[in-house]
Amino acid sequence: KVYLKHIVNGQEVMMDSAVVKNRCFHFEGTAPKDVEAAIITGFDNGSAQLLLEPGNIKFKPFDGNFPVGAKAYGTKNNDIFVGYAMLHSKNADDAKVNIVTLRASLPDSITNDDRKYMPYHGAIFNANGVYYKADVMDYYLKHIDSEASLFILKYDLYYMFKPKYLHDVFMAALPERLHSHPIYK
C-alpha cells in the first residue's frame, strides 16, 4: 500500500491510500483549492514528492526502491518542477566540471599542497554558488506567474537571501493573484 500525504503544521496528514498492483497505483479525487506540496509514502527507501493540483499527474522514472528519484509531471506546476530539478542537476554537473577544469589548469605544486590549493577551491566553490543562485533566480522569474514559483521561493530562495530582500524583491514580483495562496502568507 502507498499513501498520499500532505504536511499540516509540520505533521504528515494522510489524504488517501492505494493498493499497489503490478507495480502500479492510482489515486483519484478532488484536488485542493490551492496547489500544495504532497508526498507519496509507503516505500522502504523514502517518498516521492509532487505538487497536488488538478490533472493527471504521473511519475518518471518510478522505482519503488528509490522513489525520491521519481519526478512528477503531466500538470503545469509539476512540469515546471521537473525543469527545476533538471536545473539542480545541471548546476551540480557544471560545478563538478568547473572544479575539474580548475585543477587541470593549476600546476602540481599547487594541487598537491592543500594549503596552496584551498584558496583556489574556495573561490570556485563560491563562484559555483553564485552561478546556482543566479540560475534559480532566473528560473523563478521565468515562471513567476505559476504556483510553482511559490514553492521555489519557499524551498530554495528562502534559504539564499535575507527576509527583507526576499520580501522586497521576490515576493513583491509575484502576481497579485498569488498573494492569496497560503504559502505567500
Per-segment meaning from a language model:
Residues 157-161:
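Short coil/turn linking the two alpha-helices of tandem helical-hairpin repeats
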Residues 145-156:
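Amphipathic alpha-helical repeat scaffolds of TPR domains
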Residues 139:
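Conserved functional acidic sites
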Residues 1-134:
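A non-transmembrane, solvent-exposed segment enriched in polar/low-complexity residues
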Residues 142, 146, 176-184:
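Short solvent-exposed coil/turn linkers within tandem alpha-helical repeat scaffolds
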Residues 132, 136, 163-175:
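Alpha-helical repeat scaffolds
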Residues 150, 164-168, 184:
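Conserved positions within tetratricopeptide repeat
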